[in-house]
Every structure is written in structure tokens, then in C-alpha cells.
Amino acid sequence: MIPLRCRAGIGDNPRSSVEKVRSREQPVRYGCASLANHDSQLSVRSALRRTPDAEVRKDADDEPSRLAYSLCAAMPRRCTTAGKSPVSLVERQDARFVGVVSAAPIRKPLPVGVEPNLRDYEAMRVAFSWGAARRALAGLPDGGLNIGYEAVDRQADGPFADTVALRFLRKRDAPSALTYAQLKAQTSRFANVLDALRVGRGERVFVLAGRIPELYVAALGTLKHGSVFSPLFSAFGPEPIEQRLRLGGAKLLVTTSALYRRKGVAEMRRRLPELEHVLLVGDQDEIAEIPDVHDYRLLMGRAPECYEVARTRPGEMALLHFTSGTTGTPKGAVHVHEAVVAHRATGQLVLDLRPGDVFWCTADPGWVTGTSYGIIAPLTLGVTCVVDDAELEADRWYRILQDERVNVWYTAPTALRMLKRVGADVAHEYDLGALRFIASVGEPLNPELVVWGQEAFGLPVHDNWWQTETGGIMIANYRSMDIRPGSMGRPLPGIDAAVARRDDEDEPVIAPDGSLELIEDPGEHGELVLRPGWPSMFRGYLGEEQRYRECFAGGWYLTGDLVRRDADGYFWFVARGNDVIKSSGHLIGPFEVESVLLEHDAVAEAGVIGKPDPVAGEVVKAFVSLNPDRVPDEALRRGLVAFARRRLGPAVAPREIEFVGSVPRNRSGKIVRRLLRARELGLPEGDVSTLEQES
């Protein structure tokens, strides 16, 4: 299982944290509340009125995943605090106070009347049902459901026809935009193109591109057509691209002429017989010189603007997201059209989106966050999405937040750390008064970043947790609730989360009756587990049924992440339960990197881990054992890095390579990455009795 969130516990470096705070005795005020020590935990108290939401009622007609349940059965707002006395903000972890942090007062009040969508968490936990959330969607005749229809056609056929759906900002060219009506027309054209090319319902359409309009049109047009959309990260090297195209059984690929040449797509097509069509975006004359491809814009220009959306069933496959594995090939997580129920609900309840908002999700659409929350969730709510094609630059990002009047900003800790490096004063040069909510996902969000958000933006940063497999946000810090920096938050209404005990082999403890042994005491570490049945839950790994079944036990989905839960129901991340590397929001499987390094004629063995990094979260580090005839020197080290970058792309290739005599393996031949990580970080090596003798 590949987590989309991970975080270090607060107080990883208590001494430096305390010393830092002692040097600045500035009082703390938060926009939504004064800060107080609450039950020996950091608490940001909301001043909002909490009333039950009578519009959402409890239902009993939910239709959770039959497959998941059968598997389980088979397996034994914000208001200012001006005028109030400041209070200290105290952090606590594992019964120890580990530091005091502070933040600047609110600079600007929130516009009057903007209350949170989720006003009372406890009341919503009782009132919420997935059945009611489903009825908030339009649906299709005879119980059908289609993500593309809910995100595009429903809005275009209603009051949002002339509302900008997608606004594209470019570093070099003028900005452009698509209204919901225009998006409906363009996605209908693309669906007609798929028909003309005889792409069948359920067949896979891959898109390899940056943040260009054609990507969004292709994604939504594919969903309207009833075929399956699968995004590819444009920074991938040739091998990860080919591997995913093969595993996914790609029928059609949309990419740019530049990426087609740079990634060697022409060569890999010879090895991909199922890939029948390639549509290229780019200069018409350049495309005309490339054999056996289609010009995307020519085909779109000939296609009709009307299309009857496919009457897909809720459980019909819609999305294929690849997530890296630790001991094998990437896994293709299958998601269905019913996922849109959770996308819309979490957009409302977690991200606090509402019609008319301007929303900026900075995630690349090549990753699941960029699809679920960069495309689907906001569009189902009639929101305007900002899309920027440039890399992070502090002044540019702040100008976007200012000029586009962004209301809700969903970003990653890596970006926030880079902004923090240039200082909060830079943010104060811009009018960011339109912002009412900031959320973060993808990697560790330490407590200081939460507080720094208050200093820089007048708002704290709200962390949340989910995985590729969960398809949507599962645990979050909500706008109306207390914030405990360093915490993942509390489960989404409609989600049952628990902590399961693990044995000495890091496996869940299963009782004689087949149930999981759950941990009830607060503060004790265990594996985070979720009760299956939410709409966006993955329905399988493509072609790997057994691998999917192993994700469930005792009636629960096993996330693979270790957590603890405090007395108030807040979850805190402890450690990963697998070896997947998270670098700048990218999920990297070590096996994939090791395999490429082993193709170099100098390499005998390779083991890869994630090394902590203050900006990227982690960077890829490889330990390489050379063949006897090769000498470990700096030239070879640089050559190996360059070799890996050519094959994997800079986002995946190792940042560091260390030559070693041998790579530790257990007696079954599996690389013991735990030991590599322990040696790198100077941690205890633990039990080494199962290791092969190292040379």
C-alpha cells in the first residue's frame, strides 16, 4: 500500500525546537481561535458556532463495495482574535512537552459570512451517510453514474455554463481559460475522437503531458466516453513509462511531440502491440513528419461538439493509478465511477470548496492528487481551478494567489518549505486576503510549517492523509476543528478508522475468530486500518488479485502505515510500514531504481532507500556494490547518476550513490533496506540473524 501522507512525529529534534522558540517570545493568535494547551496537546480552538447540519440525514441504503466486503468476510471558518489576550502554543508528544512555537497575529480578517461547510464534526459523524452524498449528484438514468458527466456536463447544463472551469497560466505565453460550456464541448469532441478510433468502453487511455489544456480535456473526455483514464508523470524516464503502458494495456496514448521524441516512444511502441494509437499535441508541420501518429488538434477539429455520455455503472472502471511497489513492479490501482461520490464530499467537507471559489491544487495531474483534487473534486462543485505550468518560484506563486484571488490552496509540504526559506516577509508584500483555507498533502508536514502558515498567510496549514488506494482523503484537519500541528487529524465522516496491533513480524494480529486485534489505549502504536465500503476505495490491482486480497484482513483494509491515536481521536503518523520513498511529493519504488542500476555493466548489487531531506522530505540514495573489475571513484559515481537519470528521469533517479562491499540481504535473497536505512541514520540495526553473511 502506498501512502500519500507521511509525517514525522512532533519533536523529532526537541532541543533545537526549544532553543529556537526561546529566542523569539512572540505571542500566538490564530485566525479561527486562540491557542491553548488542551489535554496536554496542542489545540487550535475554533470560535465558530457548532450546529448540526439538518440537511444531511442518516441513511441505510449505502451500497459499499461488494467485492471488498466479500474479501473481508473471507479473511479469517475563521474570526480574528484581536483584543484577546495571547496564549502560549504548546506541543506535546508521547507524554513529553518537547517545544513551544509561536506565530504572528492575524493580519486581515476573513470576509463576513464565510462559514465552514462542515460546522460541527461530531454532529456530521452521526448525520452523514454515503447514500445521502450519492443523492447530491445528478446521476444517470437507471442508476448510472459517470465522473465526466458530474464534473463537466452537469455544470455546463446548469447555472455554471459561463463560469470559468479551468484557467491556465503559462510562464511564457498568455493565460487562457475554458468555461464549463467550452469544456463540455471540448470533452465531447475528444469522446467522439475515441469513437472514431474505435477505442472501446473500458479500454485504457494514457496521457503523458505537462499541465496543458489537452491533458484535462482528454482526461474528462475519456471518462465521458466510458473508457479508462490513466495519467503518466511527464518527468518519468522511458522505462517507467513503457512499464506502465504495458501493465495497463494501453490502447491509446496522448502526448506532445516533444515528449514523444525525448522519451523514445517510437522505440517502445515496437514492444507494445496493444498500443494502437498515439495522438500528438504540437506543431502541425512537426507532427506531419512523424510516422504512424495522429495530430490531436486535427482530429479534434473534425469531431462533433455533441456527445451522449456513456451510461456507466457506479462500479465500472474509470481510473487507473499506478503506485510503486517495494518488492516488485508498480501496481495499477483500479478506481470506479462511484469514486466521484467521495471526491465531491471531501471537496466540500475537507477542502471547504463551494461554487464560485477559485481553487489552486499545485499537484501534477500525473499523480493521484492532481487527478482527484486537481480535476474531479473541484469541478463537481462548480469551482474555478487555477492551473500553472511553471515550476515553483516564490514571487510567482504569491502573485498567482494574489492576482487570481485564490480562496482555497491545496499544496505540498515541500513547496511550503521552499516558500518558508525566502521568509514570511515576502508573502506580506502581496494581498492574499482572498485565501480562507490552506491544505497540504503528500509528505511530512511538521508543526512549524503549520504555525509558519499563520505567520505568512494569517492562516494555519491543514494537514490530511490518504493513499492512492483510498482514492480520496480519509483523515484530515478540518476548518472548523481544533488543529494539532503534527497530527493527521480525524477521520472523515463516513470513514471508520482504527489502530491494529502488529506482531514481531510486522503482521497484523488476528484473533481466533478471524477478527483483527485492535488497540483501544491512546498513544500505543499500531497499523492504521480502515473499514471498507467508502466509494473511492480501490477495487483491485489490475491483473493482481492475490496482491489485492493481501490488503485486507479481519474485515479491515490494511494501510501499511503505523500510527497512534490520542485520547481525543486525533491520529498521529509514526512510521511507514513499507519502503516506498516520498521525494517532493513523488512516490518512488526502490525496486524500480535498483533494477535500472543493475543494468549498468559496473554494478553487481544495488539497494535503494529514502534519505531524509529538509526540503524534499526524502531523496533517493543508492548503495552500490561493484563488479570485481571496476574501481569505485568519483567519475563512476557521476556516470551512474547520469545513467539512472537518463533511464528514470531526474525525479526518480538517485541523488546520492554510496559504494559498498555488499548489499545486505536475508537468506531468501531479499534486500534488507531496513538495515541500510539504520546504518545511514545511525540507528540500531535490530535483529540481523536472518541475514546472509556479508562480505
Predicted features and spans:
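Conserved pre-ATP/AMP-binding loop-to-beta segment of ANL
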Residues: D162-V164, L280, D285, P291-H294, ...
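Conserved ATP/PPi-binding loop(s) of AMP-dependent carboxylate-activating enzymes
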Residues: P491-G494, D504-E550, I588, L683-E685
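AMP-binding/adenylate-forming catalytic core of the ANL superfamily
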Residues: E239-R246, L253-A258, Q402, W409, ...
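Conserved AMP-binding/adenylate-forming
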Residues: P175-L178, N192-F236, A363-D364, L587
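Structural core segment of the AMP-binding/adenylate-forming
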Residues: D94-L110, P116, L220-L298, A412
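Gly/Ser/Thr-rich phosphate-binding loop
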Residues: D295-R297, V406-T411, K420-R484, L492, ...
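Conserved AMP-binding A3 loop
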Residues: S176-A181, R311, A318-A342
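Conserved AMP-binding/adenylation subdomain of ANL enzymes
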Residues: V341-C361, P365-V408, R421-V422
